[in-house]
């Protein structure tokens, strides 16, 4: 019988070298993200968001990236959820993209800030009606007695707002402003390629690149 210790994959699809990447990590991220899209990976826009509470206990969950540019990586959520409360206490957070079919990871660390009200309004208005109603109906991370209560709340909100529910005041965007971005490419014998970008004011790109041991 196969045991967990016997499960392993030897990565061999590609390599990663500092001479071949863009000096700007946001441009390099865009290159890799487009390659994930071209490969038709399932939901390449998913990422793990890690936060910590006031006692230093970590928690992680999958969220969807909704924007990435020189300012940082954007996602939207309920500000009163567990992650929202933890980010209000400690804005340090980490993101992880894992594209297993390409044998790649991207690790991002930095500080969280809220997006502007205008950005949150604009994205909220673009969401499907059911998702906009759901943002009102769900008191995210709170204990509820049953799904029936959630569905009743959904109907109530739908009847109240009709086709145009406004953005709830407790719902909006966050932007992770990175201090470091690591690109990881799986290699044979676990000798993976890891390139770490960190901010460097003296560099023309504003970043420096270092190779890390696997």
From Swiss-Prot:
Q: In which pathway does it act?
A: Cofactor metabolism; pyridoxal 5'-phosphate salvage; pyridoxal 5'-phosphate from pyridoxamine 5'-phosphate: step 1/1; Cofactor metabolism; pyridoxal 5'-phosphate salvage; pyridoxal 5'-phosphate from pyridoxine 5'-phosphate: step 1/1
Enzyme Commission number: 1.4.3.5
Which HAMAP family does this entry report, sorted A to Z? PdxH
- Subunit composition? Homodimer.
Which family does the entry's similarity section mention?
Belongs to the pyridoxamine 5'-phosphate oxidase family.
Describe cofactor binding as the record notes it.
Binds 1 FMN per subunit.
Q: Which residues bind FMN?
A: 61-66, 76-77, 82-83, 105, 140-141, 184, 194
Would the keyword Oxidoreductase be found if you checked this record's keyword annotation? Answer: yes
Q: Which gene encodes it?
A: pdxH
The protein's name in its UniProt record: Pyridoxine/pyridoxamine 5'-phosphate oxidase
Cross-referenced PROSITE patterns: PYRIDOX_OXIDASE
